[in-house]
Structures are given as structure tokens and as C-alpha cells.
Amino acid sequence: MIKVLCLDYDNTVFDHRAGKIPESAEKALEAVRGKCRIVLASGRFFNDVWNAPIKELIKPDGIIHSNGSMVEAEGLVLKETFLDPKLQKEVLDFAYTHELCLGGLYEGKWYTTNPEKQLSRWKGKEQLFRRELHDAGMLYEIPMHALSLDDTVEAARLIAENFPGLRTPLMNEITGGADVIPSYLSKAYGLTLLLKHWGLGFAETAAVGDSMNDLEMIQAAGVGIAMGNGVSALKEAADFVTADISEDGLKRALEYLELLS
């Protein structure tokens, strides 16, 4: 029996192409509520003013923020981890030197090493243009849970190759984009902490995701499901591949888990 349902957010629950959560996904989540614990697992930090409304919308029992850098159960913080300050400065300097687009969100403001590239990468996401861009150099002295690389696949590899203490799980195997996190963190790490807190095991869990930051979580869960719009490596690792998010993918995943019957 599935007692914990662990869900990625971007392009698993929220369809970026449509700019909304599919109606079928909304109804499916409401139908599941109360049948098992819902965990929201993302590269996002949901306590920031930009992302807090998502937390209120989904109302999860547990949250794995920033790929495991902060883990909450019913509002109780179980663990919080920040990037090493020296390593954080070094990777930001590296991004400036190589003209990479690296940055992150802090207290509702977006910081970047490359404003021009950031605006280009955000093209078609007009809702983000309302956010003023700030110099990522201001992040040197700010504790960050993670950084966001909005750049190519090659850029992600470049950082991973030069910083063994960091890893850069890809969001998309064609357009790139990656989270920049400590090498030991993952959503699976966060799920481990939640299960220990709840006194449950991985065999009682299911996980659904679409990108490489979901890989360890998909592999660790009792049942791992990849979205039809997910990256190929995740689909290969999954126990089941559901439909594309725009084709009722999340609903079909929950049907497969027999959570909607």
C-alpha cells in the first residue's frame, strides 16, 4: 500500500507550456488527499515569497525544498543545509569568468551572473519579466540552499567537471538548465529523513518526476514513475512511464498506483 506520494512540481504537477496545473491533475490530487501523505519535492525553495503560494495551493504533508537542502514534515523543519560559503563564491566567480547564467532567488529577488542570457532564456515566460534582475555578486555573503544554472547542457557539465563538491542534475536534456547543489544532496536524501520521521519505509512510497533531479528519488521509491515529457534517463530508470503532463500524465500515474479507485 502506498502511504507516501512524493511529487516533483515543475512539469510534473505544473505544466509550464500551458502555464497552469492541468484540471485533471488538480482533481486527482484532491481525490488522493487523505489516502496517503503527499510530499512536494522540488528544486524550488517554497518558503520564499515567490514560491510560498504553491505550498498553500498543494497543501503537502511534507516538503523537500531545493533538492533536499531543507526538509519539512507538517511544518517542522527536520534538516536545513546551505552551500559551503567558499564553494558558493568560487562557482559564482567561475560563472562570471565563463559567461554562464548562474544565480538564484533570495527574498523575492532574482540574482544572476548574466542578465542578458537570463532574459533570453526566459523568453516566452513573460510572467518572469516582472522580476527585476540583480547582480549575483550580491550573493557572495548570503547563505544559499542552492543555485540555479539557466544555461546549456554543456554549461552544466562544465560546472560539474570543475567542482567535484557540487552536482548539476539537468532539467532538460536538450535545452539544459540545472540545479547546482552539494554533491551529497538529493530528493531521495530528503525522502529518507521524512520516512524516518514518520516511521515508514521506502517500500511504502511512490514518486513521480520528469527531470534528472528526480532520478535518485525515482530509484529509491517503492514505485518510481516518470512523466511522458521527462528526460530519457529518468524514463529508463522508472518502473512506469505515464503520459505527457498535457495528456493527463499525473492523473494516469495516480491511476496506475490505484490511488484514484
What are these regions (language model features)?
Residues 2, 35-36, 60, 143-144, ...:
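Short, well-ordered alpha-helix to beta-strand connector turns
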Residues 3-18:
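Asp-based phosphoryl-transfer active-site loop
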Residues 4-6, 62, 200, 206, ...:
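Hydrophobic "anchor" residues on beta-strands that sit immediately upstream
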Residues 22-119:
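Active-site phosphate-binding/coordination module
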Residues 39, 64, 206-208, 225, ...:
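Hydrophobic/aromatic beta-strand patches that form the interior of the parallel beta-sheet core
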Residues 56-59, 67, 162-164, 220-221, ...:
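Short, structured coil segments at secondary-structure junctions
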Residues 94, 98-101, 105-220, 229:
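Conserved acidic, metal-coordinating active-site core of Asp-based
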Residues 201, 220, 225-261:
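Asp-based, Mg2+/Mn2+-dependent phosphohydrolase catalytic module
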